[in-house]
Amino acid sequence: MASETAFQATGAGRIVISVDAMGGDRGPAAVVAGLAESASAIPGAYFIVHGDEAHLGPMIAKRKDLKGRCEIRHAPRVVTMNDKPSQVMRHGEGTSMWSCIESVRAGEATVAVSCGNTGALMAVSMIRLRKLPGVNRPAIACMWPSRNPGGFNVMLDVGADIKADAEDLAQYALMGASYARNGLSLERPRVGLLNVGTEEHKGRAELKVAQDLISANAAAGAYEFVGFIEGGDIPGRRCDVIVTDGFTGNVALKTGEGTAKLISDFLREAFGANILSKMAAVLALGSLKRLQKRIDPRRVNGGVFLGLNGTVVKSHGSADGTGVAAAIALAARLAQSGFHERLAARLASAGRAGQDAPDEMAAPGRSEKR
């Protein structure tokens, strides 16, 4: 193991983030680039980087921003995108992903970040970190660009588990509202249940049961339930939290990302069609840059695993350095806020007495809500 420095997981103004450097589509170079960008932006962050030391050592040594901020944990094996979660659960020890999660389990790091195989990452996280008491199915929550004043909605589940019964969906509502209340600085988040229509007679039987459960839990969860919502409401103003199963959520997420890229491509083609179009593009450059920033998936890269005994942030597998840095920034905010401990307290309190626990995390740059 190569180590430039030794550091503790906790301390005044100090956070330690465990990073899987090998699992992404772009390889360790993109992860190291993201680490360097994060080191400049987050002075109190230190990193335990897991992967092939022979590859990582020279890359990290070239980055001045990472000097004294990284410890390399050699992991000779990599979980690929084609590996089945069941195989990784049985034979994953020795991989960079397993080592990354193990650092959180051992208390060496506060939060883990990986660009790797989503199913495998959830499987390893569940077997090593275990679920919080009372949680049946953990969920992955993501931020979705929206027309709401804060600019984002929270959607879950977006891929942790393709199945979810009524009780799972009700628990997703509680966890999602808890995340949105503080991540988006919302006093009383509005929760919507995704369906094929807003009418009460529409949808599968379990959705109708979930509707009743989510409505009944609204007081304990300190949220407002707006009822069924449709796909068009995901980026809209009607709610702040979208609750759905992992299959539907993942399809919606990938469709949104693909649509954003399609719009970007169409605009590029339109403004490059002829000399007049190019002149118009120059005149509209400022507006186009603002639009690109609004729809850039890298800006909101990072899905949070909710319901585990530890915090895990899943970066998009194809993330570049900017995307990885966004995921690390999210991880740092969660670590600094103590979100995991506060969410666990909320779930325990709701399970015991149907009452809300003290709020979890304050939005970046904002005071903690009470």
Swiss-Prot record:
Residues 349-370 are annotated as: Disordered. It catalyses: a fatty acyl-[ACP] + phosphate = an acyl phosphate + holo-[ACP]. Catalyzes the reversible formation of acyl-phosphate (acyl-PO(4)) from acyl-[acyl-carrier-protein] (acyl-ACP). This enzyme utilizes acyl-ACP as fatty acyl donor, but not acyl-CoA. Keywords: Cytoplasm, Lipid biosynthesis, Lipid metabolism, Phospholipid biosynthesis, Phospholipid metabolism, Transferase. PANTHER family: FATTY ACID/PHOSPHOLIPID SYNTHESIS PROTEIN PLSX, PHOSPHATE ACYLTRANSFERASE. Belongs to the PlsX family. Pathway: Lipid metabolism; phospholipid metabolism. It is an enzyme of class 2 (transferase). It is found in: Cytoplasm. One of its GO terms (cellular component) is cytoplasm. This is Phosphate acyltransferase. GO terms for biological process: fatty acid biosynthetic process; phospholipid biosynthetic process. One of its GO terms (molecular function) is phosphate:acyl-[acyl carrier protein] acyltransferase activity. It comes from Cereibacter sphaeroides (strain ATCC 17023 / DSM 158 / JCM 6121 / CCUG 31486 / LMG 2827 / NBRC 12203 / NCIMB 8253 / ATH 2.4.1.) (Rhodobacter sphaeroides). Homodimer. Probably interacts with PlsY.
